[in-house]
């Protein structure tokens, strides 16, 4: 909003549904929309932000149940205790945060969904290559992205935290 007034800033906050009319144009070989009108929904128009959010392809409770079962397939007791303790500590965040701000699994509960799909792949690969240590695969995958609950701000209007920007995936 190039010419936004103070009341626009208060009215059009992140997380609200707005109705916009605009014109698609190209600037520097990049498509953009030039806004013509912007307004809040009127009575009877869709106004629930949840209706416009990407949803996980499976029910998050199924993902939770699957991961809980897979934690018990970690046969090395110390690794299993570490995974269980950290999942307990970050339970709420892990099962609600996206896996990323943009790109892959950038939706609520995307982090848990992404982790579950990777564990499922590891389980299949472990069947094909029995010499692989499935306990190590499962524990490593389950812990690999867990720090995203510290790197990202949460499921709504996701941004990277200071730690996420400065340290991120390298720690």
At which residue positions do the language-model features occur?
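Metal-centered catalytic cores of metalloenzymes
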Residues: 21-23, 56, 108, 171
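A short mid-domain helix/strand-loop element embedded in enzyme catalytic domains
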Residues: 79-121, 143-151
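A ubiquitous short alpha-helical element
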Residues: 49-55, 105-108, 161-165
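OB-fold single-stranded nucleic acid-binding module
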Residues: 1-50
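Divalent metal-dependent catalytic cores for phosphoryl transfer on phosphate-bearing substrates
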Residues: 103, 113, 124-171
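Extended, charge-rich, solvent-exposed interface segments
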Residues: 30-98
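Generic amphipathic alpha-helical segments used as scaffolds and interaction surfaces in large
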Residues: 70-77, 105, 109, 128
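Amphipathic alpha-helical segments within well-ordered protein domains
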Residues: 68, 122-123
């Amino acid at each position: 909003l190039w010419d936004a007034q103070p009341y626009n800033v208060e009215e059009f906050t992140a997380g609200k549904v707005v109705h916009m009319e605009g014109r698609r144009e190209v600037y520097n070989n990049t498509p953009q929309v030039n806004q013509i009108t912007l307004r809040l929904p009127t009575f009877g128009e869709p106004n629930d932000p949840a209706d416009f959010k990407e949803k996980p392809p499976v029910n998050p409770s199924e993902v939770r149940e699957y991961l809980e079962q897979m934690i018990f397939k970690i046969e090395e007791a110390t690794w299993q205790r570490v995974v269980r303790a950290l999942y307990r500590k970050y339970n709420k965040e892990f099962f609600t945060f996206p896996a990323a701000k943009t790109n892959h699994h950038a939706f609520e509960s995307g982090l848990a969904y992404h982790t579950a799909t990777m564990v499922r792949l590891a389980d299949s690969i472990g069947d094909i290559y029995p010499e692989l240590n499935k306990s190590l695969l499962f524990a490593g995958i389950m812990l690999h992205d867990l720090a995203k609950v510290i790197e990202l701000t949460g499921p709504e209007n996701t941004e990277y935290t200071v730690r996420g920007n400065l340290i991120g995936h390298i720690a």
